[in-house]
Amino acid sequence: MAIRLEKGQRINLEKNNGSKLTQFCVGCNWGAVIEKKYKEVVISEGFLGFGRKTENKQYDHVIDVDLDLSCLLFDVEGRPIDHIYSPLYRFGDNKVGLPNGKLDTLDRALHHTGDDLTGDQSGDDGLDNEIITVDLVRINPNVNSIVFFLNIYNNDDYQGDFSSIPYAYIRMYEGTPTKVKEVFAQYDVATKTECVGMRGLILGKLYRRNGEWKFNAIGDAFADKSIVHTIARVIKDYSH
């Protein structure tokens, strides 16, 4: 049975059979926002324009929601040594002092499956929209911690917060990006009251202790309008 993570909870990466979880996916699944709207439709034209009848019919207006799942990797001193976030973030062009986004860590131990710009359009399909695959066996020995975080991309389509999204959850599971074998742990974002009004979320941290990897579900939410602010926050407050 999957662990339902709560804010501040720490867990060992140990499966039910006692073996360690070393190769897994960290995925985020969410739905587009559905608004009920009405439009006037003609039900009878009448005769020569007289007696024309109309009525308001309800329809679903789908609003794309672009969430971005990212992570930063730190050494034992808390210095950032690698990163994964959407290649659509071209910080080098904006001169904000951050590297451009990429989908793989330098050691290829972590891989992002790509940026989903919309969310599920027709309800929960059971698959994650954005996924970072993790292989702790291959990871650079200098990596001491990995902080995962989530942002709502700031565009004209959706200006709301996490609480307005019909469902959004993060999970760690064994399997592949297209097939979930067994869910190890899950954190439900959209159900958290602390996410009301918030657009950035520090999800959790993988970290080494005495040669073993553990996970801390952080769950700190912020009103960050840009991933730039969240990255700066992670480096300053969550790298140790």
Predicted regions mapped to residue ranges:
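Intrinsic-disorder/low-complexity signal
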Residues: M1-S145, F149-H240
